[in-house]
């Protein structure tokens, strides 16, 4: 039996649909009805249909259900059934209104899905239709009308109705898919392999993908794609992906879907696999497309492309020579050209007034060179997309420190300013101990070149007690010129700059080097742009320069010792989307991402050869996290609580264990990193220093000593400011800035909503500026035990903070064993709604 639908089409009769509708009318009156009574009414409706072949329509069936309900005395239920029919009619009207407004019938299915998945009254499409109608103008194109519909959903997003942002994402994805379909038809693309061939021919895809996989493998991999996962995105995340990460044609039209992007990245990352390669493609694709793991911006943006620079972080040790300084500038320019961020250590460069080749008082100091770094950052602007980014590090005992601390402040001599770079200071324990004990004590600043000339050693090459002995040796040596200041004056300069500019960043060098698992191969002078990397460093040196003849031409050949030019490849576990309590699943996911990051080392396009050499020697990776506050909120755990500290202590210990185990298994399969012998991993000192003495940890230590480690460094927590937006989660390990706010971008107001915001999580999401920062620092100290590198820790202060209070935060961070502090983010105290009920 065929039933005529409202649009004139027919479908096979299904008696269960009638039964479901009858039961719904009883549920609404909170009465029960037996199956016998339900099917009695269904039988009566069927009898009518058999007797009235010309009236077998949906409307007549519903009329008969109403009549039958009333005949059996179910008047209240019949009334509710009538109301149900009316509501369904209204929903159809709204649907029709939106479809007519967009002029696109194909949007109907998306709208019906939205009605089904967001059934609450606050997400009625009536609100969308009203807002959309107000945006529409008679002369709009179809594309402009779709854009207006998306905008309408975005503007309906509030902290009371946060899911409008997911509805907006569905509509945006429909618009994107429509464009992609048009592009594919125009280009004659009918399969994923066709698309990769087209993109490769256009120079938008690296030819290495098609060279590595057969057409059959490509199409098998295409079957891994799950378009349903597009629904995981909120508007902010999908919009950011579409604008900055999806491949576009040379006319800036999108040519790649979100799932195609993730599969393309997975295909690239799995290329080095010798066995079960497609299985690894699927594993990499799954963790990325489920938003459980985010790769760092360079990997997300550049994997699968011709210039596949996949690394985020680079660190250079600037030597004290003209040739060396300009080489470092050139290194920075090349790194910036390909989208990397840079850290530069200037602690070896002689101070202003130092000697050059025996001429006294002629050195210009580090500020002049930093101004060149500043200009390079501005000049090399990544194809006019954004200027370069660099943090410059200087030791707290360097003679140029006072001027350095005023690089970005608004007062003083503008010729001594560099507003586009980020200063950072390296502190020994002694400085903080003296600052805590008595701010009126004297601190002495030196020229590193003078120390080397007079004493025969570099002070910066030592740490801990050995450094303190040599520092006091310098203080007591009358042959060395000193610039003496009270610690109070230095601290005042540091704190004023921090409050005014957010910088300098903090690098606690003794804490870092004591925990260095590869101290047998060098020292760590500083961190990177975002303060999460801590790896061995050394200067690049020219060994010799020769004039030779090659093929009849005269050539100049330089022999260069590459030093340790730090490079790190990053990814983050999205804690808010992961089953943190499920140890088995977490081990598997951590092992998968560790493998992916290790493959990046083989696949990377290196902007300079020194980075490639260091990366292959150490094979360092930086696995971090995002969604930290998100994970706490969905579990009902308050930031300012011992439960927070206890929970995350266990989480990070498990992550560390899983990462070490995964790296060791990779070493068994592919070989250990070059400098494993003699490392804390090999000797077991790594585990002893951290008190990992349970049977499980002891067994792992034995396995590591026997099998080796694939990676010299493993964990580092980056800020994840962009990738956390894509994943729809909170940034790094930061608390949320606000539960909900509007951000203006290119004339549009974009909603930013705390993830999983609801009545249950509302009070858990306390603003970063209202949070007691001592809890954040204590949590960072607890995490630090389980992180072999460092973490991007931001401090949030209001204008009510005194300089003494800010100093106390720095001191607490040092006492808690925190290796680095990133920004001090200050803000005028805003009028907030009453939060006294939060407790």
Regions found by a protein language model. Name each.
Residues 80-87, 164-196, 427, 512-535, ...:
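Terminal amphipathic helices with adjacent charged low-complexity linkers/tails
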Residues 14-32, 107-121, 263-270, 733-736:
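Short, surface-exposed, low-complexity cationic segments
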């Amino acid at each position: 039996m065929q039933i005529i639908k409202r649009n004139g089409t027919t479908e096979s009769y299904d008696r269960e649909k009638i039964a479901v509708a009858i039961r719904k009318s009883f549920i609404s009156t909170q009465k029960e009805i037996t199956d016998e009574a339900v099917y009695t009414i269904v039988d009566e409706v069927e009898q009518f249909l058999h007797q009235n072949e010309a009236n077998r329509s949906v409307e007549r069936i519903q009329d008969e259900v109403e009549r039958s309900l009333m005949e059996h005395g179910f008047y209240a239920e019949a009334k509710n059934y009538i109301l149900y029919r009316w509501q369904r009619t209204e929903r159809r009207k709204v649907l029709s209104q939106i479809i007519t407004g967009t002029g696109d019938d194909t949007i109907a299915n998306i709208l019906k899905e939205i009605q089904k998945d967001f059934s609450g009254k606050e997400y009625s499409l009536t609100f969308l239709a009203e807002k959309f109608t107000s945006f529409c103008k008679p002369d709009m194109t179809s594309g402009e009308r779709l854009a207006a519909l998306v905008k309408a959903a975005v503007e309906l997003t509030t902290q009371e109705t946060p899911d409008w942002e997911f509805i907006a994402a569905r509509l945006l994805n429909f618009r994107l898919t429509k464009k992609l379909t048009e592009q594919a038809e125009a280009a004659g693309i009918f399969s994923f392999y066709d698309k990769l061939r087209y993109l490769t021919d256009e120079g938008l895809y690296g030819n290495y993908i098609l060279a590595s996989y057969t057409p059959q493998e490509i199409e098998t991999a295409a079957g891994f794609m799950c378009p349903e996962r597009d629904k995981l995105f909120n508007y902010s995340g999908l919009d950011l992906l579409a604008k900055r990460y999806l491949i576009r044609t040379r006319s800036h039209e999108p040519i790649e879907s979100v799932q195609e992007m993730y599969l393309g990245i997975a295909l690239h990352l799995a290329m080095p696999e010798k066995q079960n390669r497609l299985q690894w493609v699927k594993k990499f694709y799954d963790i990325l497309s489920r938003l459980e793991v985010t790769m760092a911006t360079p990997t997300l943006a550049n994997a699968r492309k011709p210039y596949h620079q996949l690394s985020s972080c680079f660190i250079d040790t600037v030597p004290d020579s003209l040739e060396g300084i300009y080489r470092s500038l050139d290194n920075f320019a090349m790194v910036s050209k390909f989208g990397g961020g840079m850290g530069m250590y200037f602690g070896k460069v002689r101070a202003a007034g130092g000697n050059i080749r025996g001429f006294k008082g002629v050195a210009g100091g580090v500020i002049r060179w930093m101004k060149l770094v500043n200009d390079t950052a501005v000049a090399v602007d990544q194809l006019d997309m954004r200027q370069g980014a660099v943090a410059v590090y200087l030791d707290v005992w360097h003679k140029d420190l006072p001027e350095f601390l005023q690089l970005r402040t608004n007062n003083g001599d503008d010729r001594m300013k560099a507003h586009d770079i980020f200063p950072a200071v390296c502190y020994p324990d002694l400085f903080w101990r003296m600052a805590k004990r008595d701010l009126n004590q004297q601190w002495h600043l030196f020229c590193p070149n003078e120390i080397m000339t007079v004493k025969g050693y570099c002070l910066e090459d030592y740490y801990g007690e050995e450094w303190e002995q040599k520092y006091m040796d310098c203080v007591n040596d009358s042959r060395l010129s000193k610039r003496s200041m009270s610690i109070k004056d230095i601290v005042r300069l540091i704190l004023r700059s921090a409050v005014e500019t957010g910088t300098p960043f903090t690098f606690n060098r003794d804490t870092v080097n004591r925990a260095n698992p590869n101290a047998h191969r060098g020292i760590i002078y500083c961190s990177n742009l975002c303060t999460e990397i801590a790896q061995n460093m050394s200067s690049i040196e020219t060994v010799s320069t020769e004039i030779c003849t090659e093929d009849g031409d005269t050539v100049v050949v330089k022999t260069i010792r590459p030093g340790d030019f730090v490079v790190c490849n990053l990814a983050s576990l999205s804690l808010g989307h992961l089953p943190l309590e499920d140890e088995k699943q977490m081990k598997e996911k951590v092992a998968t991402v560790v493998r992916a990051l290790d493959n990046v080392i083989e696949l990377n396009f290196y902007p300079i050869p020194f980075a490639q050499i260091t990366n292959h020697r150490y094979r360092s990776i930086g696995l971090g996290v995002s969604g930290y506050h998100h994970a706490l909120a969905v579990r009902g755990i308050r930031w300012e609580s011992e439960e927070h500290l206890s929970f995350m202590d266990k989480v990070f210990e498990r992550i560390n264990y899983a990462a070490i185990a995964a790296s060791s298994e990779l070493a068994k399969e592919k070989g250990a990193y070059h400098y494993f012998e003699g490392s804390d991993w090999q000797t077991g000192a790594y585990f002893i220093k951290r008190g990992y003495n349970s049977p499980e940890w002891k067994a792992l230590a034995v396995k590591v000593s026997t099998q080796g480690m694939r990676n010299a460094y493993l964990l580092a927590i980056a800020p994840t400011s962009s990738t956390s937006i894509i994943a729809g989660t909170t940034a790094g390990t930061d608390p949320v800035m606000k539960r909900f706010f509007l951000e203006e971008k290119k004339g549009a107001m974009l909603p930013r909503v705390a993830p999983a915001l609801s009545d249950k999580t509302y009070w858990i999401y306390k603003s970063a500026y209202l949070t007691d920062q001592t809890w954040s620092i204590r949590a960072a100290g607890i995490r630090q035990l389980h992180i072999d590198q460092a973490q991007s820790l931001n401090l949030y202060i209001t204008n009510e903070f005194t300089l003494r209070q800010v100093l106390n935060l720095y001191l607490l961070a040092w006492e808690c064993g925190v290796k680095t502090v990133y920004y001090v983010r200050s803000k005028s105290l805003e009028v907030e709604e009453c939060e006294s009920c939060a407790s």
